[in-house]
Each structure stands twice: as C-alpha cells, then as structure tokens.
Amino acid sequence: TYGASLGGAIIKNKLFFFVNGEYQDNVQAGPSGIARSGANDEWSTNGIVHRPFENTTTVGDRTFVGMNNISQYLSEKYNYNPGRYQGYSLETPSYKIMGRLDWNINNNNKINFRFTHTHSKYSSSPSSSTTPFKDSIIYPGGVDGSAGKSSSGRTSNTGLYFESSRYMQEQNFTSIASEWNSKWGAINNALRFTYSYQNEPRTYEGGTFPTVDILDQGSLYTSFGPDPFTEGNLRQVKTFVITDEFNFSSGIHNFMGGIQF
C-alpha cells in the first residue's frame, strides 16, 4: 500500500486545501486446476482433478486435443489469444483519491468543496450455468442427473477454462459535495449539494469472440471466449441531492426548517 497527503493554506486564514491519495497493488490467485501432462497422469491428485491435457494425447482409441494446441489453433486461424489456462495470478489494483477546499469568505459566509474517487476491481471465474435441458440431450455421453448442471459447468473440477472466460468486475465511485454555511443576524443557513456516480462495468481479456464450450463425456472439457453474461453487463447510478436547512432564533424560541430534493 502506498499513500501520500498534502495540505496547507493557499491564502492565510482565508483559503485552505487538502489532498490525499492511496494505492494498493493487489494480486489475486487464479484457478488451482492444472492440465494433465500425459496419458499416465492420475485423474485426481491431492484433490485436484487433471481433466484436459496440456498437449494433444491419444488414450486408447480416443484422441484428446490439448490446451496448448487449442490456443495455437485459435491464434493461427482467428488471430485470437484465449489467454492462460493454469498457473497464473491476476493483478487487481485499487486506489483512492480525495481533495478538499475550504474558503472563509468572511465572518458570515464559509464554503467548502469536497471530491472523492475510489476504484477497485476483482477477478471472477466464468458463470457456471448450464443448459436447462436434460443432460443426455445436450451433453454428449451424459446421463440424466449425473454429469450435467452444476457438476459439469465451466468451473467444475472436470475441465479447465482459458483466462478469456474470466471477467473483471470494476467498482468505481465518485462523489462531489459542497456546503455553504451563512449567517444573517439571527438566521443561520446551511446549503448542501451532493453528486455521486457509481459505475461498475465488467471487462475481460482477449477481445470480442464467441463464447465457446467444448464438451466431452457428459461434462465440460474446456471453455474460451467471454463469459456469456459479461458483455453489456454494467451498473451506472447517478444521484443528485440538494438540501437547504435554516435556523432562526428569537428569544427563548428556536425555529428550524428546510427542503431537500
């Protein structure tokens, strides 16, 4: 974590500023599954299932296309890089910045302005949703109720997905606020304005490409291309609030009122 602050007077006893910034260089662990390096590898070692092969391998009368070969084919045929599929971590940096300006206009009027912006993101695995149809209909070799649904989705332990299937969920929040405090005789008034903007888009590696699931024996073998629910999935919320509050004193009586919209 890195941070710095700076503040002081621009005009003595009149105008002041303060700024602060923080940065975190976060790293998030990637998927733990690894591919099989050869036909003699066990299907499960230390709780990790080794389903796909690193390179194209023949087992008995079947040939399994390797993850490296799929990546090479996509690169040569479509100029598309599906990304890594094992042994990687993801950088998810975050930062915060804040600034404030205070202005003592005169003895009866003071105003301040505040600005804050935060940015963070985290990496998420692709959606594990599968077809609502019976397993034997959509999954080659599948048996109803055994291999499909959650047990054979993109995040199941029987397959591996490429990095392009992951997505980054960003979280951006910006706030601008101002407050004007004034006094006229027995009347005190506070006028506040706040604007906030929440922006949470999704991003992904590899560029635009169809979502592709390769199935085998009733379950997913590998997946590449953007998560099917990521493109166009965003949240944007803008909020404006204006508040005015006044206080009037007369003898032992105190009257308060205000509006907000």
Where are the regions that the model predicts?
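Transmembrane beta-barrel wall of Gram-negative outer-membrane proteins
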Residues: 1-124, 168-195
